[in-house]
Each structure stands twice: as C-alpha cells, then as structure tokens.
UniProtKB/Swiss-Prot annotation:
One of its GO terms (molecular function) is quinone binding. Pfam families: Fer4. This is NAD(P)H-quinone oxidoreductase subunit I, chloroplastic. Its cofactor is [4Fe-4S] cluster.
C-alpha cells in the first residue's frame, strides 16, 4: 500500500507541474495579444526597405569609363566588362556590361568602389524568374530605373520601424 501512495503523490506533483507549464505558456500568449501582427500579406502589402538596403544594381552606361574596378573588387569576379581601346583618343570605349544576379551575392563592393558612381543599389528585390538565364542582366536591363514600391498604388506599403515601448 505504501508504493501506491507514493505513486499517487508523484502523479499529483506531475499534474501540478504540467498545469504550471501550461499556465506559463498561456501567460506568454496573453502578453502577445495586444501587439501588432508581425506577418504581412506579401503580394498585396510590402515593407518599405531601408536606405541601406542592397537590392538590384542600377547601371548608368554613359558614366562608365571601363576601368574594371568593379571586377577587381568583386569577391566572385562577376561583372563582365567588354571594352575597346580607341587609339585616336587613347581611351577605352565601353561595349558591353553585364551582371548575372543568379550568382551575385549583393555585397555592394562594386557600388562602393566605382570611381564614377555609375553603379548604385536600388530597393528592388523581386528578381525571381523561371529561367536562371533571365537573371543575366546586360547594360540595357541594368539601366532600367527601378519602380518604387511607394509609388505603386496597387500595393499597401508598411513602414518597418521598431515599436517604441512606453
């Protein structure tokens, strides 16, 4: 009869412990009730990216002097710069410039070290395609100005600011 009493006491202790754990979880759940939702309805709502966001690279063909600094500072030697030396003026003439965003790691070194500021990072991050070869952007695709998320009237933008606790 003595082992039966200890089993009953252990069962009671386990029940109290389980009830306490469930109560702690319930209190955490109740503390999150008055907070704003974290998730967004993505295609219809988009977060406004920060100024330092590193999205698609924008390229200005007229500013580029074909110095190939972007290729040298890129950790994966990604930008492809084709140029021709003009012997009469002894300067390089840019023929083609392309970046494969399927390989790019968006580190921003090319933008940071460009001496003529012909490269810049945009807020555009929707680069998904069904064919990976479509991610190879030439100077025409890189020169396309990005569509601002704020200007798109079909999408509700949400400012991504940390909550200020009072």
């Amino acid at each position: 009869m003595f082992p039966m009493v200890t089993e009953f006491i252990n069962y009671g202790q386990q029940t109290v412990r389980a009830t306490r754990y469930i109560g702690q979880g319930f209190m955490i759940t109740l503390s999150h009730v008055n907070r704003l939702p974290v998730t967004i309805q993505y295609p219809y709502e988009k977060l406004i990216t920060s100024e330092r966001f590193r999205g698609r690279i924008h390229f200005e063909f007229d500013k580029c002097i074909a110095c190939e600094v972007c290729v040298r500072v890129c950790p994966i030697d990604l930008p492809v710069v084709d140029w021709k030396l003009e012997t009469d003026i002894r300067k390089k003439r840019l023929l083609n410039y392309s970046i494969d965003f399927g390989i790019c790691i968006f580190c921003g070194n090319c933008v940071e070290y460009c001496p003529t500021n012909c490269l810049s990072m945009t807020e555009e991050y929707e680069l998904s395609t069904y064919d990976r070869h479509e991610l190879n952007y030439n100077q025409i695709a890189l020169g396309r100005l990005p569509m601002s998320i704020i200007d798109d009237y079909t999408i509700r933008t949400i400012l991504n600011l940390p909550e200020i606790k009072t």
